[in-house]
């Protein structure tokens, strides 16, 4: 499936392929990649998304996940789910604050790990997993 279509019978007829095919997902605010900040869920707009249902997007603020390729200003697409497996990148709620980190469980201890040595791991035992990061969207 291509992104453009051409009519071989006509000259200069290039059109977008079925642009209605992709679903849209809401951009619902900001999540930090650094020190958690207050989580306020406001729909700021929509992004096209041709992936699975149950996803939303968040803007990233901070640099704690640069080692995972998630930069300040990126948007992360998140699948809503309350659990995570070791090594997955998640969005977690800590009280009223949301953060994006790598999930790790060691026995009964849950850690939310940054991907930048300038930041410390966060004790995640009282965190609520909001979802798993499925994609990173960067605009230049």
Name what the model sees in each region:
Residues 68-140:
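C-terminal regulatory/effector modules of DNA-binding transcriptional regulators
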